[in-house]
Amino acid sequence: ALWKDILKNAGKAALNEINQIVQ
């Protein structure tokens, strides 16, 4: 379960950076 949380957090961070770049 821990690795799932890590992947989830990494995915959120990546999406946040992508959104910042787009905007």
Curated annotation (Swiss-Prot):
One term under GO cellular component: extracellular region
TM spans (from-to): none
Keyword Secreted in annotation: yes
Tissues showing expression: Expressed by the skin glands.
List of residues that carry Glutamine amide: Q23
One GO term (biological process): killing of cells of another organism
Family statement: Belongs to the frog skin active peptide (FSAP) family. Dermaseptin subfamily.
Protein name: Dermaseptin-4
Organism listed in the record: Phyllomedusa tarsius (Brownbelly leaf frog)
